[in-house]
């Protein structure tokens, strides 16, 4: 898996240490520190994915500092200041590039989020704290390849995908589609797949349902073809793993009694 790393350094310094107290509560530390960030972008895809040159260009990334779900600061990577003063407390650092969509054929979304607790320094010398964020694609790559012989028996055929991110909607791969799609998935998510066909001979329709486990940065290629005539006419499925790409190829043969 190819990787592209980038970083911008982060220093946590100490400002004035302040304390507040009451008769009912212990003193809570407060103060102001200077932070910087260390971000790692792991944009390599475990499949024959789209051109990743855009995702390796650091100037395309956005960096945010978040506290209690509120975005305090947003920077383009090229405009990121060398240091940032913040109050002591809990924060999130988020870096991302692309549009966060449930499915896309044009792009993929890359994101990293890290929680950090900022504490003020009590010494004369500034303490150094590094906040590391790793950005990765949140999607899996899927492709469907229909055999040329499908058109000899079926007037229409397509594959429907259902994921958690899609909600009540679905993504349909038509018989004329060729470009891969990038589906937003959770780790080890069970993705529902339905193969639908319409016979030329009598216009009857048939469907078969499958489930495949997918995770971000993985690939799935589904090859659909008519099955050679046999006595049972059952659907058979074979799984082949290409270790050079980690693409999972699912060969789905249409049963004899569908033709």
Please state what every model-predicted region is.
Residues 21-76, 83-259:
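Extracytoplasmic cysteine-anchoring/structural motifs
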């Amino acid at each position: 898996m190819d990787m592209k790393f980038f970083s911008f350094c982060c220093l946590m310094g100490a400002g004035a240490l302040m304390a507040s107290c009451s008769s009912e509560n212990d003193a809570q530390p407060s103060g102001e520190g200077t932070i910087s960030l260390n971000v790692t972008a792991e944009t390599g895809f475990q499949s024959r994915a789209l051109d990743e040159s855009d995702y390796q260009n650091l100037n395309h990334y956005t960096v945010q500092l978040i506290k209690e779900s509120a975005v305090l600061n947003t920077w383009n990577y090229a405009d990121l200041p060398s240091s940032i003063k913040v109050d002591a407390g809990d924060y999130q650092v988020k870096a991302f590039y692309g549009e966060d969509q449930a499915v896309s054929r044009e792009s993929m979304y890359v994101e990293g989020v890290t929680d950090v607790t900022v504490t003020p320094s009590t010494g004369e010398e500034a303490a150094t704290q590094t906040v590391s964020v790793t950005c990765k694609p949140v999607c899996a790559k899927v492709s469907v390849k229909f055999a040329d012989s499908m058109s000899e028996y079926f007037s229409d055929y397509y594959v429907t995908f259902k994921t958690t991110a899609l909600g009540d909607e679905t993504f349909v791969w038509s018989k004329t589609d060729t470009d891969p799609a990038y589906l937003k998935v959770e780790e080890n998510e069970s993705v529902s797949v339905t193969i639908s066909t319409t016979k030329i001979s009598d216009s009857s329709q048939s469907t078969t349902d499958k489930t495949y486990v997918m995770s971000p940065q993985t690939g799935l290629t589904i090859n659909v073809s008519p099955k050679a005539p046999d006595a049972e006419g059952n659907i058979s499925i074979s799984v082949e793993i290409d270790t050079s790409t980690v693409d999972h190829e699912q060969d789905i043969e249409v049963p004899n009694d569908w033709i």
